[in-house]
């Protein structure tokens, strides 16, 4: 009995140490980011001036809210509130926008409002209702859009119980999945083509399909963020769950021995190096799937290896290496290295925080 008790103490100690390491890494890179971008109202300046409500920054705030969930520091909420207040709780380019990239910031508006009771969702509701009123479901012509916009609609359904939001999200998702370019989801291989330009006959140089890591990561994260808002017995949850499981089965086979996924999931013909953002998003999804009982323990070693890979991306000052710049395929931002600086670094930090926050919860399980 004493031996069993001692073993339990050792295991608990190892778990606590593992959690401490994960939280330390998350804090380190977030502190770096908040120090570098101390004024969240300032526009970004990458080749041109853009407001800080653009999608790259919005993804960062998704990660920050996830970090707050495991590390509830008031300064995270203050930073988020200052950003949201400055942008008047409105999507980029106003309430008439139908661009998913513009709508990504609304995910954080909703989460912050639910958490604190502060802020306004009036502009978000107006924006979504205007888009639904067009009776078009073909706006999401690239798979990144599924992550940027789908969770907004599903979250709005969850708080209003207005089924029209969920119906619109599902119809739009099915259009991208089954019809855009003949269908962006390859059901046989469980992976997504980024948009109609990458559907066959387009191939990588070695003749393999072009499956972009971060693009698939966006969809994987969107499935998590949407299912997380839905009743598990609902038909919509079950529909998304099927795709989540298909993707999980495919993705675990694409992970490399060092824990990374590469920019191209199935082809190393041109870009064989590690890539951080896709790796972080896949960790986010797999850790969540295990915690929800959707994925079995076979996926746990993949999560552990992914954490070690992500840990190796972290510089001493909090900068993240192996972060592929913006683009739409494996060639974007190359060469991607430990020291290369991407055009935008905010979305990469957001992906990192999402992955580590969910892995932290898995360790606590």
Per-segment meaning from a language model:
Residues 2-4, 116-125, 136, 163-167:
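Short secondary-structure capping/junction motifs at helix and strand boundaries
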Residues 72, 110-113, 154-161:
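Hydrophobic/aromatic side-chain positions at a characteristic register within alpha-helices
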Residues 1-20:
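Bacterial Sec-dependent N-terminal signal peptides
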Residues 7, 20-58, 66, 70-86, ...:
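CBM-like carbohydrate-recognition segments
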Residues 38, 72, 88-92, 117, ...:
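Helix-capping and short linker residues that terminate individual alpha-solenoid repeat units
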Residues 120-153:
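Asp-box/WD-like beta-propeller blade repeats and closely related beta-sheet repeat scaffolds
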Residues 143-144, 154-265, 272-283, 295-327, ...:
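Extended ligand-binding clefts on enzyme/binding-domain cores
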Residues 63, 108, 152-155, 285:
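"A position-specific structural signal for the A-helix of alpha-solenoid helical repeats
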């Amino acid at each position: 009995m004493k031996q069993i008790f001692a073993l339990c103490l050792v295991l608990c100690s190892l778990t606590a140490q593992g959690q401490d390491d994960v939280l330390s890494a998350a804090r380190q890179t977030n502190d770096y980011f908040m120090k570098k971008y101390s004024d969240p109202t300032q526009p970004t300046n990458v080749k041109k001036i853009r407001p800080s409500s653009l999608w790259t920054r919005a993804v960062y705030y998704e990660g920050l809210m996830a970090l707050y969930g495991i590390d509830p520091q008031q300064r995270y909420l203050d930073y988020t509130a200052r950003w949201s207040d400055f942008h008047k709780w409105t999507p980029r380019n106003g309430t008439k926008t139908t661009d998913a990239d513009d709508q990504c910031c609304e995910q954080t508006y909703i989460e912050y409002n639910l958490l604190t009771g502060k802020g306004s969702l009036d502009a978000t509701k107006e924006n979504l209702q205007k888009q639904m009123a067009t009776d078009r479901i073909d706006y999401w012509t690239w798979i990144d859009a599924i992550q940027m916009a789908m969770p907004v609609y599903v979250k709005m359904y969850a708080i209003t119980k207005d089924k029209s939001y969920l119906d619109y999200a599902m119809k739009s998702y099915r259009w991208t999945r089954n019809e855009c370019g003949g269908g962006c989801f390859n059901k046989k291989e469980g992976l997504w083509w980024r948009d109609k330009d990458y559907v066959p006959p387009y191939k990588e140089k070695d003749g393999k399909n072009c499956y972009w890591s971060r693009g698939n990561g966006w969809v994987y994260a969107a499935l998590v963020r949407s299912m997380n808002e839905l009743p598990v017995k609902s038909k919509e949850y079950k529909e998304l769950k099927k795709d989540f499981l298909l993707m999980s089965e495919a993705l675990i086979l694409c992970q490399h021995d060092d824990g990374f996924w590469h920019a191209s999931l199935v082809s190393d013909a041109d870009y064989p190096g590690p890539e951080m953002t896709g790796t972080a998003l896949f960790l986010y999804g797999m850790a969540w799937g295990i915690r929800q009982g959707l994925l079995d323990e076979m996926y746990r070693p993949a999560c552990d290896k992914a954490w070690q890979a992500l840990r190796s991306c972290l510089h001493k000052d909090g900068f993240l290496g192996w972060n592929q710049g913006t683009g739409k395929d494996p060639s974007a931002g190359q060469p991607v290295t430990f020291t290369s600086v991407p055009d935008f670094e905010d979305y990469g930090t957001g992906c990192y925080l999402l992955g580590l926050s969910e892995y932290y919860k898995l360790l606590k399980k």
